[in-house]
């Protein structure tokens, strides 16, 4: 089952991206390098509720 998640920038804490993930394949929190338009650079984004 796919669930909706939000990805937040670890530097400025803005919630920039919304996506889905499969809880069965990825039970732990997702971490991706994404572009943050507020920091104006690629930063680590972590899954939030």
Swiss-Prot record:
It comes from the Bacteria. Keywords: Ribonucleoprotein, Ribosomal protein. This is Large ribosomal subunit protein bL33. NCBIfam families: PRK00504.1 (NF001764), PRK00595.1 (NF001860), rpmG_bact (TIGR01023). InterPro entries: Ribosomal_bL33 (IPR001705), Ribosomal_bL33_CS (IPR018264), Ribosomal_bL33_sf (IPR038584), Ribosomal_zn-bd (IPR011332). One of its GO terms (molecular function) is structural constituent of ribosome. HAMAP family: Ribosomal_bL33. GO terms for cellular component: cytoplasm; ribonucleoprotein complex; ribosome. The lineage of its organism: Bacteria, Bacillati, Bacillota, Clostridia, Thermoanaerobacterales.
């Amino acid at each position: 089952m796919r669930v909706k998640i939000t990805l937040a920038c670890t530097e400025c804490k803005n919630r920039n991206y919304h996506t889905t993930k499969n809880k069965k394949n990825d039970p732990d929190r997702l971490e991706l390098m994404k572009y943050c338009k507020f920091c104006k650079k690629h930063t680590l984004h972590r899954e939030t509720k």
